[in-house]
C-alpha cells in the first residue's frame, strides 16, 4: 500500500513540495524561493527554468529529508500560480522568453485594442473573465509579437504554450505530455467555459495558433507518469492539477453550491461554488471553472484582490517599518484603531469589483499623529475591506448569503486580521486545522484519481475547524469604517490614466 500523496505547490514567490498522508495531514514539506524579475515598472517575470529547477529540487528534497522512497508515493498533484504564461520550443524544451507573471501589466494596451474591436462582451460572456492584462491570452500575444522569430515558429507548430501546471507536467514527463486542467484553462481568456473548448474567435483576434495550446483534461485524472530520471526510476502517476484558488476551494471541502473560501496570499482570492450554474456577474466578478471531476464540471464565482500579503511585504522590504510579517499582528494591536488612516494598496491596479488597471496605491487620512503602527494596522485592515467589497458583489450576483467564510493562506494565521475580517463582514470566519488547503486540494484531486481516497464524502469528513472568529463590532462603527474605505478607494482609482493625460 502506497502511503503518501505529494503536492507540488508552485506559487508566485516560491516552489513547495508537501507530502500528505491518508488522513490529509502534512508529513513533510520543503520550500525554495526564486527570483522575481521586474524589467520595467508594472512588468513582472519569472525564469521558467528556475521554476522547474526549484520545483523539482524541493520534490526530491522532501523525500530525501524524510528518507521516503519514491515508490511510497501514490500520486503527484499539482497546484500553481494561475495565468502566468510560458511559451517554449517543442523540440528543445527551452522557453523562448521568461514567464510573464499574472501580476504583469505590460499588455494593458493590447486589452485596450481588443476593447475597441468590441471583444470585451464576447470575452466576458464566453470565458467568464473580464478583458484584462491579468490573464494569459494577451501575454501569449505579447511574446509572439516581441520575441524574434516566435510568430513564425508558432505558425509552424514548433512552439507550445502552457500555464505553470502544463510546464511542470511537460518537464516531469520529459516532454511526453502537454495538458492542462479545466480550472487552469479557464484562466487563459482563451477557453470557452460554456462549450468547454478553446475559443476560435478569441484565438483569431489574438493571432494565436491552436497548435500551441495544451489538451484540456479533468482536474482529477492520470495525465502521465514521472520520467525515470526525475525520481530515481519511479513511475509516479501525475494525477491531479488545479489552479491555486480552485485547489484551495477543493481542499476546504467547498463541494456544495454557495460554499465559499478566501485565500490570503500574495493576493487575496475569494471563490464561491455555484455548482453546475454558469453565473454571469453583474458586479465585476469572474465566472470560472472550479474543477472537472467524475465526468462533469462545476463553476465558481471569483473575486481577485491583487495585493494582500504583498502589501505586508511592502511594509517590510520597501518601507522597512516591520522586520517580519508576523510582527504586524502585535504592532496593529498596539493602537486602538488606525487613527483615521486608510491604505489602498493598488500597486498594480485594482481587481474585483473595480477592475481599474490605472488605479495606484494611496495612503489617506494622515495627520501629524499618524504613527507606523497606524499605517501597519491600516494595511491589514485594507485586506479585510477589499474582501468585503468582493463578498457583497458575490452575494448580489448569486443571490446566496454566505453563512460563514472559510479562510486559508499565510495571512489567515494573523488573528488580528481574521477578527477584523469577521467584524467588517458580520459573518463568522472559520480557520481550519490545516491551512495549507491549496496543496491539500491538489493532493486530494490526485489521490481520488488513483483510488487513494474513495470519494468527495470521504475527503469532506477530514475537514476540521481550528478557530472560529465571531463578529463583535458595533454595526454603526463597522459601517462608518467601511464608508471611509470607499472614500479612500475613490481617491486611488484612475490615478495613472489622469497622469498620462497630464503628460500629454
Curated annotation (Swiss-Prot):
Principal EC category: transferase
Residues the entry annotates as binding ATP: 12-14, 266, 309, 313, 410
Annotated Pfam families: FGGY_C, FGGY_N
Known pathway: Polyol metabolism; glycerol degradation via glycerol kinase pathway; sn-glycerol 3-phosphate from glycerol: step 1/1
Residues reported in the UniProt entry to bind ADP: 12, 16, 266, 309, 410, 414
EC numbers on record: 2.7.1.30
Known catalytic reactions: glycerol + ATP = sn-glycerol 3-phosphate + ADP + H(+)
Activity regulation text: Activated by phosphorylation and inhibited by fructose 1,6-bisphosphate (FBP).
Alphabetically ordered keywords of this record: ATP-binding, Glycerol metabolism, Kinase, Nucleotide-binding, Transferase
Residues annotated to bind sn-glycerol 3-phosphate: 12, 82-83, 134, 244
A molecular function (GO) term: glycerol kinase activity
InterPro entries: ATPase_NBD, Carb_kinase_FGGY, Carb_kinase_FGGY_CS, FGGY_C, FGGY_N, Glycerol_kin
One GO location term (cellular component): cytosol
UniProt binding sites for glycerol: 82-83, 134, 244-245
Superkingdom of origin organism: Bacteria
Subunit structure: Homotetramer and homodimer (in equilibrium).
HAMAP family: Glycerol_kin
PANTHER family found in the cross-reference section: GLYCEROL KINASE, SUGAR KINASE
Similarity remark: Belongs to the FGGY kinase family.
Protein name: Glycerol kinase
Lineage, opening ranks: Bacteria, Bacillati, Bacillota, Clostridia, Peptostreptococcales
Amino acid at each position: 500500500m502506497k502511503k503518501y500523496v505529494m503536492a507540488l505547490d508552485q506559487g508566485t514567490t516560491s516552489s513547495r513540495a508537501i507530502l500528505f498522508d491518508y488522513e490529509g495531514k502534512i508529513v513533510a514539506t520543503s520550500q525554495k524561493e526564486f527570483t522575481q524579475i521586474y524589467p520595467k515598472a508594472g512588468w513582472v517575470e519569472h525564469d521558467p527554468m528556475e521554476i522547474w529547477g526549484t520545483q523539482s529540487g524541493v520534490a526530491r528534497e522532501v523525500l530525501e529529508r524524510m528518507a521516503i522512497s519514491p515508490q511510497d508515493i501514490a500520486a503527484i498533484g499539482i497546484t500553481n500560480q494561475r495565468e502566468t504564461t510560458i511559451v517554449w520550443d517543442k523540440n528543445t524544451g527551452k522557453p523562448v522568453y521568461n514567464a510573464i507573471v499574472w501580476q504583469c501589466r505590460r499588455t494593458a494596451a493590447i486589452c485596450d485594442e481588443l476593447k475597441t474591436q468590441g471583444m470585451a462582451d464576447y470575452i466576458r460572456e464566453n470565458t467568464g473573465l473580464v478583458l484584462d492584462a491579468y490573464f494569459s491570452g494577451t501575454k501569449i500575444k505579447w511574446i509572439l509579437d516581441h520575441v524574434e522569430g516566435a510568430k513564425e515558429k508558432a505558425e509552424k507548430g514548433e512552439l507550445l504554450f502552457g500555464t505553470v501546471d502544463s510546464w511542470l507536467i511537460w518537464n516531469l514527463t520529459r516532454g511526453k505530455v502537454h495538458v492542462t486542467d479545466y480550472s487552469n484553462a479557464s484562466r487563459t481568456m482563451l477557453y470557452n467555459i460554456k462549450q468547454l473548448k478553446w475559443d476560435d474567435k478569441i484565438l483569431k483576434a489574438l493571432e494565436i495558433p491552436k497548435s500551441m495550446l495544451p489538451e484540456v483534461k479533468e482536474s482529477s485524472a492520470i495525465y502521465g507518469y514521472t520520467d525515470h530520471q526525475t525520481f530515481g526510476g519511479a513511475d509516479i502517476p501525475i494525477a491531479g492539477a488545479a489552479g491555486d484558488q480552485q485547489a484551495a476551494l477543493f481542499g476546504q471541502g467547498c463541494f456544495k453550491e454557495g460554499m465559499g473560501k478566501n485565500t490570503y496570499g500574495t493576493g487575496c482570492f475569494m471563490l464561491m461554488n455555484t455548482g453546475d450554474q454558469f453565473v454571469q456577474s453583474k458586479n465585476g466578478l469572474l465566472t470560472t471553472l472550479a474543477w472537472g471531476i467524475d465526468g462533469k464540471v462545476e463553476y465558481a464565482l471569483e473575486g481577485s484582490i491583487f495585493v494582500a500579503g504583498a502589501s505586508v511585504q511592502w511594509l517590510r522590504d520597501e518601507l522597512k517599518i516591520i522586520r517580519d510579517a508576523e510582527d504586524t499582528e502585535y504592532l496593529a494591536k498596539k493602537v486602538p484603531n488606525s487613527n483615521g488612516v486608510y491604505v489602498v494598496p493598488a500597486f498594480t491596479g485594482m481587481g474585483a469589483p473595480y477592475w481599474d488597471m490605472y488605479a495606484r496605491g494611496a495612503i489617506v487620512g494622515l495627520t501629524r499623529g499618524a504613527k507606523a503602527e497606524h499605517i501597519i494596522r491600516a494595511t491589514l485592515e485594507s485586506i479585510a475591506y477589499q474582501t468585503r467589497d468582493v463578498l457583497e458583489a458575490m452575494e448580489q450576483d448569486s443571490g446566496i448569503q454566505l453563512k460563514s467564510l472559510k479562510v486559508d493562506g499565510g495571512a489567515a494565521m494573523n488573528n488580528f486580521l481574521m477578527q477584523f475580517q469577521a467584524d467588517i463582514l458580520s459573518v463568522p470566519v472559520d480557520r481550519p486545522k490545516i491551512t495549507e488547503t491549496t496543496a491539500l486540494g491538489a493532493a486530494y484531486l490526485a489521490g481520488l484519481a488513483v483510488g487513494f481516497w474513495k470519494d468527495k464524502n470521504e475527503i469532506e469528513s477530514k475537514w476540521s475547524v481550528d478557530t472560529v472568529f465571531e463578529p463583535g463590532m458595533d454595526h454603526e462603527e463597522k459601517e462608518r469604517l467601511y464608508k471611509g474605505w470607499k472614500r479612500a478607494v475613490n481617491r486611488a482609482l484612475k490615478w495613472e490614466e489622469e497622469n498620462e493625460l497630464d503628460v500629454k
